[in-house]
């Protein structure tokens, strides 16, 4: 992994690395925050998945998470949201193609050559992190919007691999809303059964479980009713007896003003779980 940015932050280092991804067949950037204690001991890892139009920079520059990661001794890994490059398929829209990988494994041309974000996040990236950084095997996952969707899907499908999961403003029923329907049709084809593998509400209804789910949702979010539908997640978790900490916040929108307001509580939540033995 090639170090391309290095910034001192709260006694640790906010770095950005570049590497070639075997899963995605392209060069990828990834942000890694190493708290002060990482110089002397191995620490657990929180993976953060960003939303539509984002890259590895949004979370590391806008959330203020470094203060809390340093306090709680957690390495934070923030990858890009899709494969990148002139040779990678793209679309002339913000919600498909580069910047909109949806954390799935595409099966349809032309997307299936590079768009294997599920494999990248689940397998390739953690292996790289374990090899290159002072990381323990204990990891949690979180994300925002499309990334909240990705975090929920990865945790629900691999409950033994992630200690805890949380999300900000996640797309909880992608097979039922325009963002998900358009992306899934392109990436996965018209067989809607394939879509359900990447739909948190559907996965829970099929019996997939995690110990607990934490979600924060702003009530002044322009996408709340049409695209996100947090109450669908709350309802299915109640029906399936999955413990939740779902909080609705008056006045907060879909932006990083919202994420930065509550990211400290999310990191504390994950730290509590990660440090339990």
Swiss-Prot record:
Catalytic EC class: hydrolase
Entry keyword annotation includes Hydrolase: yes
Catalytic residues (positions): 145, 221, 254
Keywords: Hydrolase, Serine esterase
Hydrolase listed as a keyword: yes
EC number: 3.1.2.12
Any Gene Ontology CC annotation: cytosol
One example GO MF annotation: carboxylic ester hydrolase activity
Domain of life of the organism encoding this protein: Bacteria
GO annotation terms (biological process): formaldehyde catabolic process
Catalytic reaction annotation: S-formylglutathione + H2O = formate + glutathione + H(+)
Gene3D superfamilies the record matches: alpha/beta hydrolase
PANTHER family linked to this entry: S-FORMYLGLUTATHIONE HYDROLASE
Family named by the database record: Belongs to the esterase D family.
Reported function: Serine hydrolase involved in the detoxification of formaldehyde. Hydrolyzes S-formylglutathione to glutathione and formate.
Full protein name: S-formylglutathione hydrolase FrmB
